[in-house]
Structure formats: structure tokens, C-alpha cells
Amino acid sequence: MALRCPIVSVLGHVDHGKTSLLDKIRSTRVTQREAGGITQHIGASEIPINTIKKVSKDLLGLFKADLTIPGLLVIDTPGHEAFTSLRKRGGALADIAILVVDMNEGFKPQTIEAINILKQCKTPFIVAANKLDRVPGWNSKEGPFILNFNEKNQHPNAMTEFEIRLYENVIKHLNELGFDADLFSRVKDTTKTINVVPVSAMTGEGIPDLLVIISGLAQKFLEQKLALNVEGYAKGTVLELKEEKGLGKTIDAIIYDGIAKTGDFLVVGNPQGVLVSKIKALLKPKELDEMRDPKDKFKPSKQISAATGVKISAPDLDNVIAGSPLRIVPKDQIENAKAEVLQEVEEFTILTDDEGIIIKADTMGSLEALANELRKVKAKIKKAEVGDISKKDVIEASSYASTNPLNGLIISFNTKVLSDAKAEIEKSDVKLLEGRIIYKLVEEYEEWVKEMEELMKSDEINRLTKPAMIKILPNCIFRQKEPAVCGVEVLYGTLKIGSPLMSEDGKKLGYVKEIRDNQQENIKEAKVGMQVPVSIDGNIVLGRNAKENDILYVEVPEPEARKLHHEFRDELRGDEKEALSRYMELKQKIENNIFWGM
């Protein structure tokens, strides 16, 4: 059975050495003078099995490994972004992943996010415990780790420190996340235990071990998945859309199954459904020593087979989206391919809610990953699309906010904000969160929701009628009615302009028209302990239905009293709580209803 190269993706936290490790893997060769070694594809690097065998010859005998895969195809762009963007039906495009962890720092938020994404996509992975050279006292040198891991080459203190860091910073965290894990040389059952391979992207130590372990695991457990369909048409995923001088818009893609030929038809997903376009050229990069003229970087291929990276030149590619599924087929297979691609596009469709926020991302896979992480924190999503932020998006978000301020948000993952959208945001109440790291965007979303809920709570409290008790001061009646003017003391709560007043027997007296301070300046409210002159408009006639030393209450409608009592009691000051309690007791007595306000 013919096997294709396993597709390998590299994930991990920022600054834990993903790019350095990838660079080290890509530069793998037997000697500096050896030509080639690594074949550079579009968007990926192929490490031939012969190169792996040569750099790992001492290990293959040790592990009794007989590698039959043609090599490894390592995706050039590290990180979650690339991993989530590169999807195919049934999960991730990558067959297997390398999770990079700084063995001196341990797990970080993005490490955990990477593991969650790998679990979600059911992608097997090994752990590269990087920065081995920074373990105190460790004598790190290029070559296999396993041949350097002994007391002949390492000081006993360095060996002890290594074991502590390996366990405390890597294995223990994996255990806490529900994985059995161990140093790769101690793993007895690879179906149950995660292999941890110590490496140094700086010195190159452990790179041969890493290549052997990942090749062996891929061959052993993914054989059916790696079976090459030598007769079938090509299946792949769009990496990105690129403008190339002399070619116009081109697609960079990873082909994971089948064979493609020049003159075949490209069938690819786009926002309108499916695009069909006749292929003008299938292009591969020239070797570095051929790249003398940057305008002449590519060479045409009559035929390509999986797994490979390829640049596709064809007409009408403007609306193709990164992460879209594609097929390359002869004319008589176009309809079958269209049905397949449509089905895959529909599987990427994100279920939306009746109300919620807008999310935008640069690729279908990224959009799906962002939506999944937001769902975990109970976010409601009204609209989820691939593409730049437009003025229309902002107008829609503004209309969503009119019914619920928590809906007035756009989250943008790795997309541009068009100039007219920026202008619209500046004059609207819409919040925009932008970023390139999903977990940070989710954290920012949670912080924004918390702030908005506090603001909304504050606004709602301010709209409610606040409880207060006041006493009419003796010798301070200045006018009996229309409006009545007198001096009062605020006993409990806050007296505000517009507050409705009632007597102790429940009679409506009117509402507070004006409050003045001691300098006779108008003020909006008087707090507990203040003595102020007030004017009261309504039924009140001082000396008849309200007299000196009488206690008056701000009349709080029952639904508002209930809200204050149940939802906002903790937000009230002590004197406001007292005013509310006394008012509710009075109303329960007047209404002969012990449940009033409860």
C-alpha cells in the first residue's frame, strides 16, 4: 500500500520556541555540504525519509524502527492560527501535531488552548519539551537526546534538575489535564501515554529523537489515514490567497489526498457556495539555488500528488476564503466534487443565536475555533462570517445593541477593519475587539461583559425610585400649597427631585419639585442627615394632611421595591436598606399583605 507523508503541525505558547524548533527541523541535513535534504513546498517543508534515517541512524536500531512512510510534510506556519485555519472534513488537516512547551516555564494559557483544540479535533500529538539547553548545568549538544542522557555526559546535579523540570513543568500538567505522559524512552504503550521528547531548538539536541518518534507514531497509528489514493482526484485546503506578479490572484494550498494535473478543474468553496475554475498552472517553488530572479520563483508541474503544498493559478479567484475545502478534478467529475465541497462548507456553518454579538475571522477554521471558545464562556453569537469588518457589520451591531447593550460588540480575529467601518464605529456605541490570539480575545470579551453588566446594573439602579424617609422640620413651613414649601431632614435614604411622596397612612401627597442647599442653590438630591428646603407639588396642604414633625416616605412602586429588595439590595447603602425595610413594613401593614414587595 502506497503511503503519503503525514502532515505535521507545530503548536504551543508564545515564546516557547515554535518557530525556532520549526527552523531547526527545516534545516535538518546530514552534513552542511549535503545538497537538498529538505524540499520546500508551498506553505510546507518535506523532510524525506532518507534524511530522517540518516540523522537518526543510531536511534532506529535502538528503537527497532522500520520507517516506510515517504517522509514528513511539516506545515511552515506554526501556532493555533495555522492549525485551526487548515481544516478538512472530519477535523484538522494535520495528521499529527508537535506541542512545544518550554520545560523551564511550564504550561501557559496558550498551551492549554492548544491542547483543547487538539482534543476537539481528535489530533494525536507528542510534546517537545524545548529549551533543554537552559536546564542548569546541562551539557547540550547537537544530536540524539537519548545518547546524551547519561551520567557520562551529564553532571548528576544536572540530571536531577532535568528530571524535576520535566515532571513539574510538563508531565504533571499533562496529568492534571487527564493525560498519561512520560519521557519517550520510558513509554511502554504509546496508545495510552503521551511521548515527551526533550529538545533544544538552539543546539539541535533531541531533533533526531523527535523526528523518529513522530514518524514512527504516524506510521503505526495512521496507516489507513495515510493510504494514498493513487487513482483518485486531489483533495485539499486553501492556505491563503496571494497576488503574484505576472500570475494575478493565486491560491496556496495543501493537498492531502489524490492526484492533480494541469488542465483539471479547481472546485473550491467561497461565500457564494462553490467556484469552478479551469487550472492554468500547478506551481512548485524552485530550489533556493535556482531563485536568482525573484520574479521567477516558481516552476510548473504537470502532475502533483499528496501530501504536498502547491500554488494554483486559475481565473476568478477573488472571493476564495482561506481554510476553504478544494478539489482538483477532470471535467467529468466536477458535479461530484461540487457536492463534496458544498457538504464540507455546510459542516463549517456555525449555528447562530436569535440575538448576540458579531464575530469575524480570516479563515473558516479560525472562525470555528473562535466560536467554539466563545461558546465555552456562554457568549451568544448572532452573526459569524469570514472577512473584513465592514460598515454594514457596525450598523447591524448597533441595531442589536438597541435591544440589549451586550449585543453591541464585534470580535475580529486577524481581519482588517475597512475605513468606512472605522468611521461608523467612532460615531456609534459599538465596541470592537481585535486580536490574533483566541484566548486573549475571549478574556477581553469576558472583561467587557463584566464592565457592561456593572454599567447596566448601575443604570438600572439609577432608573429605579430610591427609598427615603424625611421629617418636616418644626417652624419651617414657608408655604402651605401649590407648591408647598418647607424645611425637611432626610432621615434615611436619598431624596431626589421627582420623588413621589406619601404620608404614614399611605395617602399620596405629590412629588418633590425643587431641593435647595443652604446657599439657596438648586440641587438634584439630598442625602441622609441633610436639612434642606423643598417644594412639593400635588395634593399636599401643609398644616392639614401634612404637619410639622410628620414622617413622609418616598413612594416606591411594588415592582421596583421587589427589584431593590431581591436584586440590588447589596448595592444599597445601609441607610437606604433601612429606608426600604421600613417602607416595605409600612406598605405591608397598609395593604394588609405580608408579601407586599417580597
Curated annotation (Swiss-Prot):
Stretches for region G5: 200-202
Pfam families: GTP_EFTU (PF00009), GTP_EFTU_D4 (PF14578), IF-2 (PF11987)
Keywords for this protein: GTP-binding, Initiation factor, Nucleotide-binding, Protein biosynthesis
Region spans: G1: 12-19
Superkingdom in the source lineage: Archaea
Start and end residues of each stretch annotated as G3: 76-79
Gene Ontology MF terms: GTP binding; GTPase activity; translation initiation factor activity
Domain named tr-type G: residues: 3-225
Region (G2): 37-41
Metal-binding found in the keyword field: no
Chain residues that bind GTP: 12-19, 76-80, 130-133
Gene Ontology cellular component terms for the protein in this record: cytoplasm
Region (G4): 130-133
Xref: NCBIfam families: aIF-2 (TIGR00491), PRK04004.1 (NF003078), PRK14845.1 (NF011418), small_GTP (TIGR00231)
Function: Function in general translation initiation by promoting the binding of the formylmethionine-tRNA to ribosomes. Seems to function along with eIF-2.
Family: Belongs to the TRAFAC class translation factor GTPase superfamily. Classic translation factor GTPase family. IF-2 subfamily.
Entry protein name: Probable translation initiation factor IF-2
